Amino acid sequence: MFVDQVTISLKAGDGGNGITAYRREKYVPFGGPAGGDGGKGASVVFEVDEGLRTLLDFRYQRHFKAKKGENGQSSNMHGRGADDLVLKVPPGTIIKSVETDEVLADLVEDGQRAVVARGGRGGRGNSRFATPRNPAPDFSENGEPGEELDVTLELKLLADVGLVGFPSVGKSTLLSIVSKAKPKIGAYHFTTIKPNLGVVSTPDNRSFVMADLPGLIEGASDGVGLGHQFLRHVERTKVIVHMIDMSGSEGRDPFDDYQIINKELVNYKQRLEDRPQIVVANKMDMPDAQDNLTLFKEQVDDSVTIIPVSTITRDNIEQLLYAIADKLDEVKDIDFSVDNDEEIGVNRVLYKHTPSQDKFTITRDDDGAYVVSGNAIERMFKMTDFNSDPAVRRFARQMRSMGIDDALRERGCSNGDIVRILGGEFEFVE
């Protein structure tokens, strides 16, 4: 089964908690703090495996949770960091945030990695908070929560050659002839509903990967007939082989077919019209095909490469393979990265995924309570051990240093009012 798009949920591992401990050895009267730090939580990492061709593994498992770091121990022993959770994906996988639609990673080469969900850092033990004024702190820090997000995995096949054309023009038949691929072939439209890949070898020992793509129809660039899903796989092909039914057996004019498909390639706005193209005039064994080919050559530009073939009698197949291989030899490496002029926040590629540290916001609940939210304050809230009075006092100092107290006063918060952070309730005290 070919799966080329799936949405999954990721949860990176939380950092381990730091602990509060003291040296208690004999003959050490002023032992001091000895609480170790927690270990780092595991990150969720995607890695390219060139042996994979589909996202099938993600169809049945949609939720991935990385391991938590170990807690710190006494004697200043740090907890062990958790090993990263590595998820294998095929070459050509794009990872997008469901929330923002930003491209988080574009994985092309074998072994290429991308950290998509960062594991939380370990909480600090009490020995980290020792100061001359407080040489024996009696509080520690919880581990930082790991990042949690939903992402969409989108596969764009990395094939050298893409077969495009209307349904039932012979694309699957051609692939089955020139490679060992066994695509489904039938005498009806849209027999092929998922791309098929095949490795093609020429008699002079040149080889390339050919993709048989589902048939396109007018309006495909606007999504008609699942056009976006099909055209997506053309984006990363170096050469486009445009197959046309030159016999007109479906009642369509070959030149009209040629214009319609090329119009869809232009409208898709991924520079597909700039790719080298070879026109394959198929079904030359049928009546009227030769006359149609003569007229077709008069209608198209002289620079268009046209190879007449018959996938039934297998005429000129070898000549076609040589033409494709020669065209690939001429093509330079194509930069498949996202255009710089595309709208930021929609198709922007982020080469380094870092956590955002936005400012806090203050809102009011229906009962009049003040609600403080923001990445930084919520992170501190989760890392505070509220069972420890010194840790609670430290959290209050952090809120003051961030300016939250002053901001609450400006919003009208007074003595005794309720302040909420992530479901926790506090009483505002002047």
Curated annotation (Swiss-Prot):
Recorded GO CC terms: cytoplasm
Subcellular location(s) of the protein: Cytoplasm
Residue segments, region Disordered: 118-145
Enzyme class of the recorded protein, top EC level: hydrolase
Domain Obg: 1-158
Location (main, coarse): cytoplasm
EC number: 3.6.5.-
Single annotated GO MF: GTP binding
GO biological process: one example: ribosome biogenesis
OBG-type G domain location: 159-329
All copies of domain OCT, residue ranges: 352-430
Listed cofactors: Mg(2+)
Ligand binding (Mg(2+)): S172, T192
Positions with a binding annotation for GTP: 165-172, 190-194, 212-215, 282-285, 310-312
Organism domain of life: Bacteria
Keywords: Cytoplasm, GTP-binding, Hydrolase, Magnesium, Metal-binding, Nucleotide-binding
Stated role: An essential GTPase which binds GTP, GDP and possibly (p)ppGpp with moderate affinity, with high nucleotide exchange rates and a fairly low GTP hydrolysis rate. Plays a role in control of the cell cycle, stress response, ribosome biogenesis and in those bacteria that undergo differentiation, in morphogenesis control.
Oligomer and partners: Monomer.
Family of the protein in this entry: Belongs to the TRAFAC class OBG-HflX-like GTPase superfamily. OBG GTPase family.
HAMAP family named in the record: GTPase_Obg
Name this polypeptide is given: GTPase Obg
Organism: Staphylococcus haemolyticus (strain JCSC1435)
Gene: obg
